[in-house]
Amino acid sequence: MSETQVPVVISGAGPNGLMVACELALAGVRPVVLERLPAPSDEPKANGMVGQVVRQLDMRGLYQRFTGSDDPPQPAYQWIFSGMSVPLFGVPDNPMYALMMAQPRLVRLLDERARELGVETRWGHELTGVQTRSDGAAVDVSGPDGTYTLETTYLVGADGGRSTVRKLAGIDFPGHTSNTIARIAHVRVPDEMRGPNGGIDVPGVGPLPFGHNRLDNGGFIYAEFERERSMVGTIEFDEPGDDLEPMTLDELRDSARRVLGVDLPVEPPLGPGPHALRRIAGQNTRQADRYRAGNIFLVGDSAHVHSAMGGPGLNLGMQDAVNLGWKLAATVNGWAPAGLLDTYPSERYSVGERVMMHSMSQTALFGPGPEIAALRKLFNELLQQPSVAEHMAHLLAGSDVRYDVGSDHPLAGRLVPDVTLDDGRRVAEMLHGGRPVLLDLSGGHVGDAARGWADRVDMVAGATADLEVCGMLIRPDGYVAWAADSFEADDENRLHVALQRWFGVSRAERGAARRDGGLSSAQVAERTA
């Protein structure tokens, strides 16, 4: 059976796939999301988000929805790198934001938001085949009532590290697998072992802080979520083995004894669960050799996998989703300039490379041996230096990569500062609708010059002493496409170039070209470039 054409099919209803769906639906595009699981999974995975993605959630009104607070996000004053503290108190424009939330709850909330926006998520429907065409793809699906085919213009693979979409698209996944075994479980810890600030005091070892701890015989991880449920994990290096037999709590106890040198008196957690109890044999660090194959795109773990140390996964994957989402929507809606979709892989690939670099570095610094111990002492000294801490904050937050947007202004290519205008409006609130914003701080001159794009770009006039610019053009993903400190004739020309580069030609030019020859927005852009 073949169904009616749908503009976009998304394979995978995890955080990344659902975020793409929400971005499309905000722009009036209704995707179909396919998920092989019959319902959202309660399996414990990530425990929160860090970095730029927290601010992007704020730009959609989701941060407030997720936290139940009207307050904007605040940066963390400390983070970790391979278990070593990175003090961030003195970092200017600190980009390290954090939102602690279990991944199952995140998926439920994003699914709820997607349904509100009109997204159809088909739980229990698995993508099994793809036949590519010049204008899209035919997607084979296996569902509860049998098999069927969806015709689509675009296909997004958000189906994890073993991505079916990636394999069917013929996209290679090169990388490295390390010889480590990680074991993780939710447990109950005796009250007398609970240390200050969320740490644990292990008899015979002493206090160990919250998070990753490197010891002579491996790594020990501790995180307390609630009184009757803590997460305990171990990392052992150069240990061969397989991942065939189910993980047991006794296996974790044995591993903890090898790492700590003492028994760890933990018991199963109370409550219905589900509770984490898993083993990860080998740590994969891999990146797809390309994020796009024709009309097929990869986001999140489908495009890259890496160590979870430092928590970069959702920051990387959900930013992929927001970057791709608005560009796909612009293309489906007919106003995307030529080459807009090509900027998705060109912008996001290098960000993935940076995450793999620092996650592999953290894993290496967690390894055994006196040489690594000496190297960690050196790193600990360096991390106390303000300039090093600032560099690490931007690396871990993902704000060290600047997109090439065709402008050399210091703000261009970076996430927009969340300033508050004199009338109380925050820049993040202006982006709740997922549309581009032209912020006019010139008294009206900037906005007047861009009236031809008012059907696609929200014009916002205001004043603030917190920005020394007369205007900024902000993409839907929150990145600055153009900014100017003054607004002379050359600045107006550069604004028009930026508007056309990211949001197509003006309404008048598009209408005239279509009357003359029925051209698409991309064709109009090519003729007027």
Where are these regions (language model features)?
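FAD-binding beta-loop-beta segment adjacent to the flavin cofactor pocket
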Residues: 281-298, 302-304, 412-433
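A conserved short coil-to-beta-strand element within the FAD-binding core of flavoproteins
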Residues: 123-137
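Helical substrate-recognition/capping region of FAD-dependent monooxygenase/halogenase enzymes
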Residues: 2-7, 11, 26-27, 83-85, ...
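Conserved FAD-binding catalytic core of PHBH/FMO-like flavoproteins
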Residues: 154, 158-279, 288
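Core beta-strand elements of the Rossmann-like FAD/NAD(P) dinucleotide-binding domain
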Residues: 4-6, 145-154
